[in-house]
Amino acid sequence: MKNLFNFFKTSSELRLAYRLLKQINQKRSFYGAMTDFDLANQTNIFKKRLANGEKLKDIRVDAFAVAREATKRILGKTPYDVQILGGLILDMGSVAEMKTGEGKTIASIPPVYLNALLGQGVIVSTVNEYLAERDAEDNGKVYNFLGLTVGINKTEMDANTKRMMYNADITYSVHSELGFDYLRDNMVFSAAEKVQRGLNFCLIDEVDSILIDEAKTPLIISGGKTNLPAQYLSANQFVNTLIAEDFYIDEETKGIKLNDKGIDKANAFFGLRNLYEIQNSEIVHRIQNALRANKVMKRDVEYIVQDGKIALVDQFTGRIMAGRSYSEGLQQALQAKEGLEIEPETKTLATITYQNFFRLFKKLSGMTGTAKTEEQEFIDVYNMRVNVIPTNKPMIRKDERDEIFATSHEKNQAIISEVERVHKRGQPILIGTSQVVDSETLSEMLNQKGLYHTVLNAKQNQLEAEIIAKAGRKNAITIATNMAGRGTDIILEPGVTELGGLYILGTDKAEARRIDNQLRGRSGRQGDVGISRFFISLQDQLFRRFTNFDQIFGAYGQTNGAIKGKYIHAVLLAAQKKIEGFNFDMRKTVLSYDDVIRQQRDLIYAQRDILLQIENFDHYIQKMIIRAVDIILSYDFIILPNQEIHYKNLINFLNDNLSRITHFNFGQIGIENYPIEQLNEFLIKQLETIYFKQIQSVLKENLGKTYFESERYIILSTLDSQWQNHIDTIDKLRSSANLVQYSQKNPYQIFTEEATKKFNILVAESAYQAIVSLFNNSNAEKIEYIKAILSDGTAISYPADSPQEIIDQIIASNEERIAAARKAKEEKQPEFIEKQLAKLKIEKVESGEEFELWKIGDNKLVNLKKEMPLDEKQNILVKMQQEQLEMMSEEEKNLIQEQNLEIEEIEEIEEEIQNENPQKVEFVDFKNDPDAYNKLIFGADYADKQLISSEEENNNEKTNININEDLERTKGEAQQTAKNPNE
């Protein structure tokens, strides 16, 4: 355990964790002596302390000690010191890297328990529902014992059940369902329909898998189906006529495009003059998808065909991505390629990336066995540091040097020979593959040798945990894709240790060293023996895509047996580092584009939340009328180029669009008497009179006091419709942005400018369309919908504030803010005094109607009148403590002094952590920021915030990597790495 308390080369967070661990260990005997009832009752005591103004960190040591003791009693497992260390790091909002088998699930119990005491909900995110159910059941026993409730959120649950699960103190859920529930919550028409209750604290299991590997994959809710199978079939038919000389594939980026020969063939096939004319953009889009589906994507690698459907395969885990499909027509292109039924193409209704969803949580932490290599990305994107937690027992697994062969055939033959050799002595072996097709090839070769084995890939993942759990038995041969049962321990059968433990055989290097380390980590858990080795060939994708393949293969392609020498190993490591950097750049690009959409999405969702709460829309409708009139008077058939008004067109337009319900004749109010400078104000007053005096009275007659529900429905549905059209357009804009590089402009800048313009149109158009709908609101269907909402028995509670009051509050003056700050400071004075007393080990333990009970030190209790000013109480308590100290022995005084020094050291380390941590990405509070609110509601120019400077443009510009030009740099990296092969 010497390493455990070695402070050298440890982060500030770990140093703080060591200090806190010492204090937690000192509480062991105290809580260990409690009865079950008293131990469980600590939850109520902690909640009272929090209600009285204490912070989580004030009760952290005690809460961790209680959780540790409860875990020991309920699960029969006493958390190791390293598990408590990991839990402390998680509570700090960072990533805890704990090696496989070190007990991450147990380590999560104390931080989850502590944060659940706030009563705001804690979410534990897992990579699949099996792990969510398993951990909720096991850890839930501890939480239930301590008086907390536990819920499991599942995909198939209805809204009411989901709401119940989210209302539990602690909710376990697969990560994708959390994001989809968030999107669905922002599509409801009643606040009571939401299932989530705010995003407080989330602990992510296998955090690297979710926040790194899946960061590029957006969550999408689709709808509005369009069925055009003939277009996909014709594009597929055209692509099948092409030969290799008709297109160009970038092996590194997997990008594909037609060359001049291919363009000529496309023009002839589709009867076009110029394929790339703007009116042919839809054909270009279909051809591009067909090219990618037929020439780049491989069956049983990126996808499989299952039950007549295309099923996506996660490239990092090997799992089927259930319920997922490609968007923007790529799914249909694959269906055409495979001769399957072509499903209707859908449009995007709501979307968010994992990066931006998880950044919405007030506090975020994660645990995994492999994250240190990606620490910079965790810091840059999520403001989370990675802390490597020491193992409970020394790691004794042997990681052998890679075996590199010239060809895939030679590699596979060597793998089978190695499996035969290892299997003869009964040692279990786990073979890790990166692709389904590789696992099936090796399986067939093992069958030919008569070697019984089990295969686990995307086609047989239902029994994942069971198959992986058995991989540690004698004579077991298991083939698994990269999923490798993360989260499931492989327990060695008795006698296997003497055989050398579990043998891990990797058949391909992944696109990240972290993924390789995950595979290795299946062996050598908790000090077990084990061995790992990778068998690689020069024909593997890593060599093909990220080295100068022709030169490397030319030099080593004729080698028989394993290739010797440091250089080839160094080239492999350099290629792996290169693809890690490339993928990081890709994820940053996705995030930069999504951040533009995020700002717009946050504005819309904040606006929806306000619309769901208010009960009087009059002020809101007045503002929309102003916007609508601005739009009407911007039409060039009404305001002519010479700034003259075409009154007849204006009157006809108003009668056609705004008088269907009232049959009001705008030609009889003297519009033609108003010049252009007075017309705007005149029309606003007329429309306000028509709506509030006539139309609203019809609503009140039909719906009584709940007429505002009809207004809410119309305004929300209009906003949603415009937003859904907007994001569908933005998705297509993003996918085509890179095609405009010929204009010598940054694609990101073009995307930002266009997205901003389109958002401004969305804001204006949603206001105008809402006014048109409100002025024509005689639709019985809408009224019946409102009546249905009101009669479903749901209790809907809304604040009494009117829209005007909300807006007045939001745009409060600086003087009011200053006054509020002064008041807040005064209110914090008692908290400050109590903190000072806490440092002296003086704390309030109970508060009655007339008296308060204070504790001095460990045992002295004092009753003081509640009405007594706090500063007077402070003087009395400090004086009594001084008297108590004078009666103490020197040994007791020294102990107290040592404890006070520890507290000071902890505070210093906490301040150090605060100072060294990078600034967290600040999100605009759109509900409380007057500028953001005004921009959305009142249509102020939103573009200024979005446009990037030329300097930012250069920073965001993506660097293209050319394989041929990169050879010298690769050689340099390889030679440097060869000097230190253990890097």
Curated annotation (Swiss-Prot):
GO terms for biological process: intracellular protein transmembrane transport; protein import; protein targeting; protein transport by the Sec complex. Its EC number is 7.4.2.8. Gene3D superfamilies: Helical scaffold and wing domains of SecA (1.10.3060.10), P-loop containing nucleotide triphosphate hydrolases (3.40.50.300), SecA, preprotein cross-linking domain (3.90.1440.10). The keyword Nucleotide-binding applies. Transmembrane segments: none annotated. ATP binds at Q83, G101, E102, G103, K104, T105, D489. One of its GO terms (molecular function) is ATP binding. It is a peripheral membrane protein. It is found in: Cell membrane; Cytoplasm. Keywords: ATP-binding, Cell membrane, Cytoplasm, Membrane, Nucleotide-binding, Protein transport, Translocase, Translocation, Transport. The keyword Membrane applies. SUPFAM superfamilies: Helical scaffold and wing domains of SecA, P-loop containing nucleoside triphosphate hydrolases, Pre-protein crosslinking domain of SecA. It catalyses: ATP + H2O + cellular proteinSide 1 = ADP + phosphate + cellular proteinSide 2. Residues 948-983 are annotated as: Disordered. It comes from the Bacteria. One of its GO terms (cellular component) is cytosol. Pfam families: P-loop_SecA, SecA_DEAD, SecA_PP_bind, SecA_SW. Residues 973-983 have a biased composition (Polar residues). Belongs to the SecA family. Monomer and homodimer. Part of the essential Sec protein translocation apparatus which comprises SecA, SecYEG and auxiliary proteins SecDF. Other proteins may also be involved. Part of the Sec protein translocase complex. Interacts with the SecYEG preprotein conducting channel. Has a central role in coupling the hydrolysis of ATP to the transfer of proteins into and across the cell membrane, serving as an ATP-driven molecular motor driving the stepwise translocation of polypeptide chains across the membrane. This is Protein translocase subunit SecA. It comes from Mesomycoplasma hyopneumoniae (strain 7448).
